[in-house]
Amino acid sequence: MAIYLFKITNKHRKSIWRKIEIQETQTLGDFDQKIRESFGYDDDHLSAFYRGKAWSAQGYGEIEPGGQGRGANKKIQDLKFQSGDKLEYIYDMGESYISLVELMDIGAEQAGVAYPRVVEKNKQRNKYCEQCKLKGKKQVAVYNVYYFEAESLEQLCEPCMEYIEEDIDATEIVY
């Protein structure tokens, strides 16, 4: 059975990527679930794959949380991908987290291996909490906090988040 090796790269932060292998008989729903797991995405938003650029190219259908939707049951082998083919993957249609997806290689299945699987990922480059830096501490930041009125962004650790107002927009940092 053929195994497809894809590289999935965050469109706006190219230093964040994963390489995922998937069997030809598995589906875009299976692929979507592995991407969600590997990037730490929740299971509460729609996603979709597009051949070429997102929104303006051939889409394969939306994938709902839990693996349902028009695009979920499309088998990898039926999409006729060739090495070098490029897709765009969108997670969360509102926020539009866009990743570039490139087919790197088509190889043979390894016995005893469970697919899909992450075979490689970027080296983690930690960002550090800005509040802790001011206190002379070095604590890994886990949240991007956006202050709308000041139009500023701050990266904070878990303990410093306890002192932030509830109506502030905060998202987890993906490493």
Which residues does each PLM region occupy?
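Short linear regulatory motifs enriched in tryptophan with gly/pro/ser
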Residues: 1-175
